[in-house]
């Protein structure tokens, strides 16, 4: 495998990440980097947090160098409009224009859907805490190296308050 340039986006605000670190818990972006390095060392990974950056001038000029983007979780909810969320939506719009391969996990999906004009709302069924059962891999997914050793149907830990509406 040739070295790939990946951008990992941190979704939590700096105060949340400080709290994680003070309690010996890795941030979402640190956890993603660690997981990826277990899979391969042929990655150049940069981390960016649009919550704490007042300007995207440092990253936008070189954004096309990334072969992919991974946008992970956060304790934020997209419908709780604040400047940190607005910055993330704005940055995701730039990513959607410039990076072809995007993996949006949980919070990342909320940001991507909103940036693309969709809607996310608090689930009327309450929080989903526990195990997501019977996840089915589609035909595209079955050929991806991440899923090559998985069964076509599997279970995974899940924790969600929100749902994509459109």
Model regions: which residues?
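Short loop/helix-cap segments at secondary-structure boundaries that form the rim of catalytic
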Residues: 58-64, 111-113, 166
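Residue-level detector of flexible, active-site-proximal loop/helix-junction positions
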Residues: 13, 52-54, 109, 127, ...
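Cysteine-nucleophile active-site neighborhood
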Residues: 74-140
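Short, structurally constrained coil/turn elements
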Residues: 39-41, 114, 150
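Pocket-forming structural segment of enzyme catalytic cores
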Residues: 11, 117-166
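N-terminal beta1-alpha1 cap of cysteine-dependent amidohydrolase-like domains
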Residues: 1-84, 89, 94-98
């Amino acid at each position: 495998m040739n070295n790939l340039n990946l951008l990992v986006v941190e979704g939590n605000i700096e105060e949340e990440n400080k709290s994680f670190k003070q309690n010996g818990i890795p941030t979402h972006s640190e956890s993603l980097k660690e997981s990826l390095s277990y899979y391969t060392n042929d990655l150049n990974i940069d981390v960016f947090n649009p919550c704490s950056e007042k300007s995207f001038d440092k990253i936008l000029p070189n954004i096309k160098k990334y072969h992919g983007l991974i946008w992970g979780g956060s304790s934020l909810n997209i419908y709780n409009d604040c400047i940190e969320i607005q910055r993330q939506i704005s940055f995701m719009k730039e990513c959607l224009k410039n990076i072809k391969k995007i993996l949006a996990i949980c919070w990342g999906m909320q940001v991507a859907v909103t940036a693309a004009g969709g809607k996310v709302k608090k689930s009327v069924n309450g929080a989903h805490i526990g195990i997501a059962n019977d996840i089915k891999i589609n035909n595209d997914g079955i050929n991806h190296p991440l899923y090559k050793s998985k069964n076509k149907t599997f279970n995974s830990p899940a924790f969600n308050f929100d749902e994509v509406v459109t």
